[in-house]
Amino acid sequence: MKTIIDNFVDRVIEYGMYNEIDKIYVKNRVLALIGEEGTDRISDENDLKQIKDYLVEIALKNGKIKDLIEEKECLGAELMNFIVPLPSRLNDIFWSSYDISPQEAVEEFYKLSKDSDYIKTSAIAKNIEFRASTKYGELEITINLSKPEKDPKTIAAEKLVKATNYPKCLLCMENEGYQGRINYPARSNHRIIRLKLGDEVWGFQYSPYLYFNEHAIFLNSQHVPMAITSKTFEQLLEIVDILPGYFAGSNSDLPISGGSILSHNHYQGGKHIFPMEKAKFESEFRFKDFEDVNAGIVKWPMSVIRLQSENKNRLLDLATKILNKWREYSDLEVDIIAMTEDVPHHTVTPIARKVDGRYELDIVLRDNHTTEQYPDGVFHPHQDVQHIKKENIGLIEVMGLAILPPRLKPELEEVGKYLLGEDNAIADYHLEWADQLKEKYPRINKEEVNSVVQHEAGQVFARVLEDAGVYKNTPSGHEAFMRFVKSVGIN
């Protein structure tokens, strides 16, 4: 039997970062972090992350850290950093492996990101995930419970921390190996693969809180704002060449219609087939001078033009033409406004794929203008569906995966109780919806109530996406969509 400290050190050495001769050195470096008291307890635990958690508790008892989630996270990341190679070494390993098998190189990097607890697999497992059948196919729903809530002690401690602008944001290269602090996540065990996209250096990493399989983030090595241009399409298509089986997409570059981080240019990708990818063409056509590119409108709640070609450059040129036209295009009949004075309202959310040697680019048209009636955005979730989703509709939602806030776990349970006629604490903003459900399901029972509420939450998400779609799925909406397509030029 081994002591807990020796058990940890042996596991570290198994990962190949250190040799047997380094054993005493590694042990002493760990003791420096956690203190010496309590490390002689016997442990036969095999899971490295579990051993790490025990060591963090020892450090707490030894007064090395305070009883704050953030301090525990910082120390935990520092301990798991023992199994992760230096960035230079990891990049050498990745690209050497890539030369033999790109898929294997990616799988190894993904595994290391999970093994080192950079990807928070235990926290992600808390998420509630379900699917809902809609007229657009099966949509995916996640109630996000993975990110820890701040407790009052943390909030109080944050007020005492001096402001700093290092790293500038969560997507900067400077996060690699960053210790973390009370108001900033621990990144000691974080590594980034460098890759060239055209003439720029970018980083490839995974999201610590995955929303889907192999959820990757690609970030510009420079802290520059989001910008959708011809270069965006070029880089997305390059990523799907570099990483076989991955899609790559970008949030839009304007507020309301984009993601939560507009200050740092980045893309997302991964190995997941989203509901939108499964959606078929509603109508097909050929753009003028691009007869070799398959094109059409996708049967989807948002307004999507899909382009397909084996010729990447032709796809790139046509996508750029569509983007440039959309930037300046207005159609007041359907409340589509490209510009208010000097403020632009039009952009796109692009998604690239490569399937069986053929490139595919989905161009989702976005408009972020507001009115008195819709102060949050004309093409933003409207007031009557904000009880389920009021946040911006970014890339992941666009593709058919709802990321819903933690509040919905208890709130949907209360909706279920309300439908059953039981004592409940239903939130006021769910009442109108719940009454509609009561009318729709007058004889609902306990066995089915949960699946009914989940199914109906999925229908609300479909409506959320319809709200964000600039052209509605009506005859007049389709007619207006075709007016734009014709303005680009079709045969």
From Swiss-Prot:
* Family classification: Belongs to the galactose-1-phosphate uridylyltransferase type 2 family.
Question: What Gene Ontology terms for biological process does this UniProt record contain?
Answer: galactose metabolic process
The compartments listed are:
Cytoplasm
Q: What class of enzyme is it?
A: transferase
EC number from the UniProt entry: 2.7.7.12
Q: Keyword annotations for this protein?
A: Carbohydrate metabolism, Cytoplasm, Galactose metabolism, Nucleotidyltransferase, Transferase
Report the catalytic activity.
alpha-D-galactose 1-phosphate + UDP-alpha-D-glucose = alpha-D-glucose 1-phosphate + UDP-alpha-D-galactose
Q: NCBIfam families, alphabetically?
A: galT_2, PRK05270.1-2, PRK05270.1-5, PRK05270.2-2
Q: Name one Pfam family in it.
A: GalP_UDP_transf
Top-level division of the source organism's lineage: Bacteria
GO molecular function terms attached to this record: UDP-glucose:hexose-1-phosphate uridylyltransferase activity
Q: What is this protein called?
A: Galactose-1-phosphate uridylyltransferase 1
Organism, scientific name: Streptococcus pneumoniae (strain ATCC BAA-255 / R6)
Originating gene: galT1
Q: Which GO terms describe its cellular component?
A: cytoplasm
Instruction: Identify the pathway.
Output: Carbohydrate metabolism; galactose metabolism
Please name every pair of cysteines joined by a disulfide bond in this record: none
